């Protein structure tokens, strides 16, 4: 039976050398729709598949009211639930009467920027990929992201009592996620 040292050498002999490179990728997504008061829409996506999410910028923008200066703007809520356990929300507001009502969810430093351009030994590319993508403290934002848009309050668009030709509002959600994508290539036995 081989000694422990001989077994370790055999394992090392089967290891292969891989070059590790992380490339920045900008993932953009846009959705739009129409919601009436009390309705919600749920959108699911997985922006960080095969990489690490670094930064998130998202904005929900509502269409303008028919008479924007006379009537209150509609109130919507944008919420985000990540599979990794982080949840947040933002309610629409209008900072300037010349701009559309909007809500934003922004967050930087979701994970740290990984080092790039080095080599590692491993038995397989798949094992190395699993190891690097699942490092402790670097898994924020992995898995499915669930966006929910809710029309909380949609005031009438005309000042005439009981008449509301538009009982909701059109909306657009724009999401940009900076992801560092892992690229592994074998460079030697």
Regions inferred by a protein language model and the residue ranges of each:
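Single conserved hydrophobic/aromatic residue that forms the stacking wall/gate
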Residues: 1-11
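C-terminal edge strands of extracellular/lumenal beta-sandwich accessory domains
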Residues: 83, 134-189
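A short linear-motif detector with a strong N-terminal bias
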Residues: 2-3, 36-38, 58, 125-128
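A generic signature of intrinsically disordered, low-complexity regions enriched in glycine/proline
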Residues: 7, 78, 85, 127, ...
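Acidic, Ser/Thr/Pro-rich low-complexity intrinsically disordered segments
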Residues: 34-114, 142, 149-151
């Amino acid at each position: 039976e081989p000694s422990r040292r001989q077994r370790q050498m055999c394992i090392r002999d089967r290891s292969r050398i891989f070059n590790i490179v992380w490339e920045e990728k900008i993932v953009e997504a846009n959705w739009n729709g129409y919601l009436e008061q009390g309705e919600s829409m749920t959108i699911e996506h997985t922006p960080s598949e095969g990489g690490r999410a670094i930064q998130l910028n998202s904005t929900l923008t509502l269409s303008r009211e028919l008479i924007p200066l006379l009537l209150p703007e509609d109130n919507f809520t944008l919420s985000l639930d990540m599979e990794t356990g982080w949840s947040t929300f933002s309610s629409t507001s209008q900072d300037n009467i010349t701009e559309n009502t909007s809500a934003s969810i922004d967050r930087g430093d979701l994970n740290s920027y990984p080092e790039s351009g080095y080599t590692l030994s491993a038995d397989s590319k798949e094992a190395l990929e699993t190891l690097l993508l699942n490092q402790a403290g670097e898994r924020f934002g992995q898995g499915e992201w669930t966006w929910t848009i809710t029309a909380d309050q949609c005031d009438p668009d005309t000042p005439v009592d009981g008449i509301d030709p538009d009982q909701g509002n059109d909306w657009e959600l724009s999401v940009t996620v900076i992801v560092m994508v892992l690229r592994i290539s074998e460079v030697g036995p």
